[in-house]
Amino acid sequence: LDVFRYQAIHNVIYAQFLDLLRVDPATVSFPTDIPHMPIGLFKKYRLKSGEWEPVRTFTSSGTTGIATSHHLLSNEEWYRENARCAFELQYGTLQDRPVLALLPAYLERTGSSLVFMAEDFIQRSGHPESGFFLEDLPTLSQKLAALKSGPVPPLLIGVSFALLDLAEQHAQPLGNTVIMETGGMKGRRREMTRPELHGVLSEAFEVDHIHSEYGMTELLSQAYAPKNGRFLPAPTLCARVRDITDPLSAVATGNT
């Protein structure tokens, strides 16, 4: 509630949004009553609370001619620490863990928060085999084969279509490797349900579980699903579902 009231005062666009909804911040007594800001506002405005110059701007992916979301960052180190905390809460320390990132669609553009996070994880790991892999699947496959039986389970984090490419071209048992998909076919393949995707990857790499990461430009926190698609949010993330046409109305469980 303190954060809400701060933003209601210092975020000009959010203050206008509350005014249009005729919501008096002083009357909001419970977190469940906080009005949610539509994602569309991140596309139309540069949102920030207070007066400061951004040190970095995260942008969402999008096709030519389509407006993308922008999220301004005032402190890069805060984002790094927050992302590390969310990951390490579920998986333990990044230090000495091999981190192999397969994020071709994201590496090909600027402003990706996922690439920024993965870059920090790679540096934080301090492992000589950690790094990004754009399209060099043979080298990635060789590294995974060498690391799969190591003392620390390696992390393979990748966009869905690229992991499917790896599964088709270089299927192999990956032992205790943490294989983590970040979603996204990016128009490269047909869309698949998460259970279908995980089934294909589990069979190709002979692992019991495929892990999932969820994040978005408009959020500065992540959620992770170690198994069964059940996402566990970071301490700084509280998810609530609202009606797409009414930011004050909650959506009942089981509805969309």
Question: Model features per residue range: what roles?
Answer:
Residues I9-T59, A67-L72, N82-Q95:
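Active-site diphosphate/adenylate-binding microenvironment
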Residues P38-E51, E76, D136-L137, R189, ...:
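Solvent-exposed, flexible loop/coil residues
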Residues G62:
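N-terminal nucleotide-binding beta1-loop-alpha1 segment
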